[in-house]
């Protein structure tokens, strides 16, 4: 126990020293940062101060110019006002002349008005006769309209009486039905209200019991969580102390625990289940696709050749690729001789094509065969499906399609190599043929 106390006291002393060093470091760094912040604020505000002084100087000059302009404007306004007074006196003389003209025009208008009155008297007498004739016609038309209105009112009153009779009959028929529906609705409402009251009466004790259980669980959880940290710290301190003072005892405990774990049949069953799941995962179709794609990317240097060299037959390459994809789960157990044989099978179509091209005379070749070979040369060297549309830089090899280039560029930088010359790919360029 004394050794435990010594270790605990030593740890406390070390923590105090570390706290003191951290406080001194924080004080020094904070003072240095404060001085740097003050210096930066001074340097930062110096241009602003200079600009503010220049701005105030410009404002003073601008205000003096505005005062000078205001004096000039006021002087100009006084001159214009005097000129306007002179013009107003001239206008008064013109007004007197205008008054004389108005007097002459008034005399002419009065004479014309007298003439118009005579003409209007003649016209008004004719208009009175015409108005009397129109009144007679209006009285006759009003009598005719009264007769027609009376007939229409009689028809409307008869129709209204007929509709009121039909409504009375409908009310007499549907009234009892509505009363029956009201009684049924009131009965159902009474039953539902009594059921709700019974449910509330039964729910109150259940709610009290649930609240009591929740409060007890909350109290227990708070007690466990408060004491859990202390228990964990005590267990950690005891484990470290036992490990430091008695390492042999710790090793014996570990070996005994491992032996007991290996002796349990459940451990072996769990291990067998994990191995079976790993075999199923490795034998799945998705894992086969991923493994075949990785093997295709790894076999690029074996597929490549010089730029423009004829590639192997697509059907043979596809058959070899299918065979390799079917044997992926047993790839870890295949020998080196089988891998060498598969590599030889993959490279054989290319060499056979080159040998046939060397044996055939230049003049006796079939043009359709040449065209087919030319189309095959345009295919991607990896998938043998799409056309070559991407130029690799700086090696300048046109050998990949867009999809294979995207898959290649997803790899790390040190794996981005040309499949023909194995040089690093720094940039790609799309080519449209």
Swiss-Prot record:
Catalytic activity: S-ubiquitinyl-[E2 ubiquitin-conjugating enzyme]-L-cysteine + [acceptor protein]-L-lysine = [E2 ubiquitin-conjugating enzyme]-L-cysteine + N(6)-ubiquitinyl-[acceptor protein]-L-lysine
Keywords: Endoplasmic reticulum, Membrane, Metal-binding, Transferase, Transmembrane, Transmembrane helix, Ubl conjugation pathway, Zinc, Zinc-finger
Gene3D superfamilies from the UniProt entry: Zinc/RING finger domain, C3HC4 (zinc finger)
A Pfam entry, by short name: zf-C3HC4_3
Zinc fingers, RING-type class: 380-422
Mutagenesis / variant outcome for changing residue 399 to S: Strongly decreased E3 ubiquitin-protein ligase activity. Impaired ability to mediate ubiquitination of TMEM173/STING
Acetylation listed as a keyword: no
Database matches in SUPFAM superfamilies: RING/U-box
Places the protein is found: Endoplasmic reticulum membrane
CDD domains the record matches: mRING-HC-C3HC5_RNF26
GO cellular component: endoplasmic reticulum membrane
Gene Ontology terms: biological process: endosome organization; negative regulation of defense response to virus; protein K11-linked ubiquitination; protein localization to perinuclear region of cytoplasm; protein ubiquitination; regulation of type I interferon production; ubiquitin-dependent protein catabolic process
Enzyme Commission code: 2.3.2.27
Tissue: Ubiquitous. Up-regulated in several cancer cell lines.
Membrane topology: Multi-pass membrane protein
Primary site of residence: endoplasmic reticulum
Residue ranges crossing the lipid bilayer per the database entry: 24-44, 60-80, 147-169, 183-203, 220-240
Impact when changing residue 432 to A: About 4-fold increase of stability (from 30 min to 2 hours)
Biological pathway: Protein modification; protein ubiquitination
GO MF entry, a single one: ubiquitin protein ligase activity
Keyword Zinc in annotation: yes
Subunit description: Interacts with INCA1. Interacts with TMEM43, ENDOD1, TMEM33 and TMED1 to form a complex capable of modulating innate immune signaling through the cGAS-STING pathway. Interacts with UBE2J1; this interaction is important for SQSTM1 ubiquitination.
The protein's role, per its UniProt record: E3 ubiquitin-protein ligase that plays a key role in endosome organization by retaining vesicles in the perinuclear cloud. Acts as a platform for perinuclear positioning of the endosomal system by mediating ubiquitination of SQSTM1 through interaction with the ubiquitin conjugating enzyme UBE2J1. Ubiquitinated SQSTM1 attracts specific vesicle-associated adapters, forming a molecular bridge that restrains cognate vesicles in the perinuclear region and organizes the endosomal pathway for efficient cargo transport.
Protein name, as recorded: E3 ubiquitin-protein ligase RNF26
Organism listed in the record: Homo sapiens (Human)
């Amino acid at each position: 126990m004394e050794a435990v106390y010594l270790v605990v006291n030593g740890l406390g002393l070390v923590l105090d020293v570390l706290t003191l060093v951290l406080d001194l470091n924080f004080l020094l760094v904070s003072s240095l940062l404060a001085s740097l912040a003050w210096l930066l604020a001074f340097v930062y505000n110096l241009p602003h101060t200079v600009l503010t002084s220049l701005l105030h100087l410009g404002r003073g000059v601008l205000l003096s110019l505005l005062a000078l302009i205001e004096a000039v404007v006021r002087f100009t306004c006084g001159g214009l006002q005097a000129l306007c007074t002179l013009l107003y006196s001239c206008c008064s003389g013109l007004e007197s002349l205008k008054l004389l003209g108005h007097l002459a025009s008034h005399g002419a208008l009065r004479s014309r008005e007298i003439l118009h009155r005579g003409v209007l008297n003649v016209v008004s007498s004719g208009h009175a006769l015409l108005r009397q004739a129109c009144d007679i016609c209006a009285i006759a038309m009003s009598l005719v309209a009264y007769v027609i209105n009376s007939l229409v009112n009689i028809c409307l009153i008869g129709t209204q009486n007929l509709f009121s009779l039909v409504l009375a009959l409908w009310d007499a028929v549907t009234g009892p039905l509505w009363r029956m529906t009201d009684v049924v609705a009131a009965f159902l409402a009474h039953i539902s209200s009594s059921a709700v009251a019974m449910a509330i009466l039964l729910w109150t004790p259940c709610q009290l019991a649930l609240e009591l259980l929740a409060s007890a669980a909350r109290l227990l959880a708070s007690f466990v969580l408060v004491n859990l940290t202390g228990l964990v710290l005590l267990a950690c301190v005891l484990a470290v102390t036992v490990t430091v003072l008695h390492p042999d005892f710790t090793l014996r405990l570990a070996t005994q625990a491992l032996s007991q774990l290996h002796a349990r049949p459940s451990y072996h069953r769990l291990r067998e289940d994990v191995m079976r799941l790993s075999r199923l995962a490795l034998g799945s179709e998705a894992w086969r696709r991923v493994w075949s794609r990785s093997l295709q990317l790894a076999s690029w240097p074996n597929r490549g050749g010089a730029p423009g060299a004829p590639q192997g037959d697509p059907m043979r390459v596809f058959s070899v690729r299918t065979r390799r994809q079917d044997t992926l789960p047993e790839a870890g157990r295949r020998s080196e001789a089988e891998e060498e044989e598969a590599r030889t099978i993959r490279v054989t179509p290319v060499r056979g094509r080159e040998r046939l091209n060397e044996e055939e005379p230049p003049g006796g070749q079939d043009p359709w065969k040449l065209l087919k070979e030319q189309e095959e040369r345009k295919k991607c060297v990896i998938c043998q499906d799409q056309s070559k549309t991407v130029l690799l830089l700086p090696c300048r090899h046109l050998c990949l399609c867009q999809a294979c280039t995207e898959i290649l560029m997803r790899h790390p930088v040190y794996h981005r190599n040309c499949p023909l010359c194995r040089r690093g790919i720094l940039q790609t360029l799309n080519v449209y043929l």
